[in-house]
Amino acid sequence: MGVQYAILELEHHFQNKSSIYVVDNYIGLRTLVHLKNSPTGVNIILFSDNVGNNKLHNIEFIDFCKEYPTVNLSMKKTGGIFHDRFIVLDYGTANERIFLCGTSSKDAGARITSIVEDYGISKYTPVIATLLKNPTLILPQ
């Protein structure tokens, strides 16, 4: 019950946002499921190198896009420089917020973890600006 509540609370933060950026090298189908209820018009970018045994595949992404056509989701590479996972909301606006995540998004809800807001947003600005210039992530077949 507690873990599900934490996931619902996180998804609540996704409402009424202009952008949601998720930095996580271990993405999977569950990552997409957490984003399925995002409002229309929100720009969502997953930054990942898609590593690990249960990585996201192109067919899963295609099926997700067909089932949730109003979710504006794209993916970019991280370039192998991230260990931690982050969620950035409303990047570049006065409402910008950033969260450090203890678990990978593909595992969120499976075990107890921490998601902590970091109020030192300015230190992330150049990192996020660099990520936005990275190439598109190509998912395996």
Would you name each region that the model predicts?
Residues 1-18:
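Positively charged, amphipathic N-terminal segments that serve as targeting/anchoring signals
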Residues 1-3, 26-141:
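PLD/PLD-like phosphodiesterase catalytic module centered on the HKD motif
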Residues 13-20, 38, 67:
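Short hydrophobic alpha-helical module
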